């Protein structure tokens, strides 16, 4: 791997920036290309599991957890640490059902992280600034391992040692290198809303339920309505909500199952959603924000729930084309359960580590070593995430039965 051609990373999300930061910290040249502008918004929060943030902090030089939470926690501006209580609430009665593993000595500490803040924090964890070039939407990938060429829609061309595909579930790189791998649509309905409210209103309406927790996880009879803090200041709280359930029947007669909506149409609030929310008989605080009048003042999106699975042979074939995959480009999974961001971090850490460890050897072998670790880990997670969707959208009778067995 004597060549000083840079590694070309397509996508400035969590996986791409993690890869770039660790390669840069190891002295390996790389450039990150991002289709959107620097001010793109993706300010919702994600759950970082203990195994995910532990390996990240270790890879960045054994940083303390407080360094991470001070930089990324949704409530960092008021001294919070992104803590969540993991409690499950009945959204029809506003009563707490249970706390998973409440009395377990091995209960996992989950940290909530604002996505924008996490990207900035990762990018800043090193002495040398990352080379991130915005406004570069990929058009073409050509060549082979050791000498790849990429062309962008703005007319720019670059040569590199290899390409890292960090460009998400609808990966342009994957569509060209592994065209037969298509995202699978999970038969689920998911609407996501964002809103802001004064801090005093948050303290009055949510604090009695959440305390210091950054999530209020509400479940109903086969549907979910979690609230989450995205960002909190002394005066205002930016929050989001989700409304999700399995598709009814085959989906053909389900007015809310619309997996192939155009992006502009996905931002419109359908009458069927308003009617369905009204039929749910929600308790406060859910009823105050999930109603036809309130959501007209929110930014509401219809999200298609998709996942991506690949074979080990697919990945090896891509190596010959000079491409390695990280993040959702090769293991997109439903958001329920909070694993996707953690595997994106792990990918970046493991790929950068394999490349650095094999810096004096064969690059193809180094990438193969990465997949020896990452393929089973990530593909097992895709399978788990699909199963978890149905577990998290069970009938209320099952939730109440569970609550009898688990402590508050």
UniProtKB/Swiss-Prot annotation:
Query: Which residues are modified by glycosylation?
Result: 91, 103, 170, 231
* One GO-annotated biological process of the protein: secondary metabolite biosynthetic process
May I ask which residue range the UniProt record assigns to the signal sequence? 1-20
Protein name from the UniProt record: FAD-dependent monooxygenase nscC
Name the Gene Ontology molecular function terms of this record.
FAD binding; monooxygenase activity
The protein's job, in short, is: FAD-dependent monooxygenase; part of the gene cluster that mediates the biosynthesis of neosartoricin, a prenylated anthracenone that exhibits T-cell antiproliferative activity, suggestive of a physiological role as an immunosuppressive agent. The non-reducing polyketide synthase nscA probably synthesizes and cyclizes the decaketide backbone. The hydrolase nscB then mediates the product release through hydrolysis followed by spontaneous decarboxylation. The prenyltransferase nscD catalyzes the addition of the dimethylallyl group to the aromatic C5.
Q: Record's superkingdom?
A: Eukaryota
InterPro entries the record matches: FAD-bd, FAD/NAD-bd_sf
Source organism (scientific name) = Aspergillus fumigatus (strain ATCC MYA-4609 / CBS 101355 / FGSC A1100 / Af293)
Gene3D superfamilies, sorted: FAD/NAD(P)-binding domain (3.50.50.60)
Asked if the Swiss-Prot or TrEMBL record annotates the protein with the keyword Glycoprotein, the reply is yes
